[in-house]
């Protein structure tokens, strides 16, 4: 369970890390007593930044980072896979059974350009990820009124080609104390994000199972689709369309009256809006058998 400024949220992926001032994790019985069965796996309590008394302060932050694969799964190269296929063919010819689907004579034919390649598919579909984040915030206030406003933009180019994530968010936090015994405030969060993804399970399966000596392009330059029952990961990366646009808005208002140091009254009002729009297209080139 995630609690942001006292409000339970189903998903916190829209929160800008630069908006967070503190985070606490609860796993004891007290959390269950407060939040019930929803806290069975623990509670994450997040508090966002508030304005501080004083002159307005403007902060601009920019961060750039890189990401790479920490480990690559070892794969057989062309020579190793041909040797395996040769042993496999001889085994089936000797003992029967199986379904050998290639001829070593053809695969070793140096004039057959379609099979005379040595592909490292994982290397072909991955690259160094680039991440950029920009935040512009302003905060300040008086003894009675404090405010904090932050707008952030995050852009990530994925490690897998043609994947990525973008997010634009704005947070407006305000607190007003007209008297020593009355407090009120609001927390407004607006987020738009766009994700460009792929079916990673299908893609990585093709990377690990497709023979390295199968060409990815025909002589005319067009991409090979499904060949010999095996999908072409290069075609999957280039022709899969999978975009998800997410719109999120969260409005929170509180009103508090302190009767004494032991007793106070607090009312919370919260409204949430979520909308996801997904566009996905997988052409027959990457799903059907094309020779």
Task: Show where each model-derived region lies.
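N-terminal periplasmic accessory domains that precede
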Residues: 33, 39-62, 134-136
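Short sequence motifs at beta-strands and strand-loop junctions characteristic
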Residues: 36-37, 126-130, 139, 162-166, ...
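Residues on the lipid-exposed face of transmembrane beta-strands in outer-membrane beta-barrel proteins
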Residues: 48, 60, 136-140, 170-176, ...
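Surface-exposed loop/interface segments of Gram-negative outer-membrane beta-barrel transport/assembly proteins
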Residues: 53-118, 159-163, 169, 173-250, ...
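Short beta-strands and strand-coil junctions in structured, solvent-facing domains, enriched
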Residues: 9-11, 29-34, 51-54, 66-69, ...
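Short acidic/polar hinge/loop motifs at secondary-structure boundaries
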Residues: 5-33
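Outer-membrane beta-barrel transmembrane domain signature of Gram-negative proteins
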Residues: 111-139, 143, 287-291
């Amino acid at each position: 369970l995630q609690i942001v400024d006292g409000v339970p949220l189903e998903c916190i992926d829209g929160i800008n890390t630069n908006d967070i001032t503190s985070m606490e994790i609860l796993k004891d019985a007290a959390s269950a007593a407060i939040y019930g069965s929803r806290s069975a796996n623990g509670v994450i309590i997040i508090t966002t930044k508030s304005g501080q008394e004083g002159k307005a302060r403007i902060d601009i932050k920019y961060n750039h980072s890189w990401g790479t694969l920490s480990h690559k799964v070892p794969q057989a190269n062309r020579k190793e896979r041909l040797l395996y296929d040769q042993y496999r063919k001889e085994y089936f010819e000797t003992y029967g059974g199986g379904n050998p689907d290639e001829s070593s004579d053809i695969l070793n034919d140096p004039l057959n350009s379609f099979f005379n390649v040595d592909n490292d598919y994982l290397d072909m579909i991955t690259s160094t990820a680039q991440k950029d984040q920009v935040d512009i915030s302003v905060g300040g206030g008086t003894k009675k009124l404090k405010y904090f406003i932050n707008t952030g933009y995050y852009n990530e180019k994925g490690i897998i080609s043609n994947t990525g994530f973008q997010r634009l968010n704005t947070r407006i936090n305000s607190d007003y104390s007209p008297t020593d015994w009355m407090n009120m405030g609001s927390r407004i969060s607006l987020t738009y994000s766009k994700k460009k993804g792929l079916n990673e399970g299908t893609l990585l399966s093709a990377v690990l199972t497709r023979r390295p000596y199968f060409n990815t392009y025909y002589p005319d330059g067009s991409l090979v689709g499904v060949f010999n029952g095996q999908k072409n990961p290069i075609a999957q990366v280039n022709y899969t369309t999978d975009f998800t646009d997410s719109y999120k808005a969260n409005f929170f208002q509180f009103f508090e009256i302190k009767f004494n140091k032991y007793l106070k009254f607090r009312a919370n009002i919260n409204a949430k809006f979520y909308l996801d729009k997904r566009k996905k297209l997988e052409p027959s080139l990457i799903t059907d058998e094309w020779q």
